[in-house]
Regions:
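Sec-dependent signal peptide recognition
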Residues: 2-8
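Short, linear, compositionally biased motifs with a strong N-terminal bias
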Residues: 10-11, 83
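N-terminal signal peptide c-region/cleavage motif recognized by signal peptidases
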Residues: 12-17
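N-terminal alpha-helical modules
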Residues: 18-125
Length: 125
């Protein structure tokens, strides 16, 4: 039992210390790490919500949703990233904010589809 508890306590402590570090990043690398972690979580949430909405739709509506999602991804990437000779630059705050807005949009579509029916034009946005 002691062999299990100690690693769990160490893991919990390191996660708590890391979480506190994200509240007040010490330098640019900490900020990039924290922003990246936040974006990754938002991206996972987005994928879950997209799948939830998609499962509730008929095939034609799924195609419309996919078209809208791909267009949105292109828009997010164009707005929040830049390609230069040195490589790619991504504004993670921009990407996270846009992703959170998209999650809210998809949740609205999910509520709409389950209550009054889907509006195809909105699915394609």
């Amino acid at each position: 039992m002691k062999k299990i508890v100690l690693p769990l306590l160490l893991a919990a402590f390191s996660m708590a210390a890391h979480a506190a570090g994200c509240a007040k990043p010490r330098n640019a690398f900490d900020q990039v790490y924290c922003s990246s972690t936040q974006f990754s979580q938002s991206d996972r949430d987005l994928n879950q919500e997209y799948d939830r909405v998609k499962q509730a739709l008929h095939p034609a509506e799924q195609a419309t949703l996919k078209h809208g999602q791909l267009a949105w991804l292109s828009q997010r990437d164009a707005r929040c990233s830049l390609e230069k000779d040195e490589g790619y630059f991504v504004n993670l705050e921009c990407a996270t904010d846009m992703t959170q807005q998209r999650i809210a949009f998809l949740r609205e579509r999910e509520r709409e589809c389950s209550s009054t029916g889907c509006v195809d034009a909105k699915l394609g946005e």
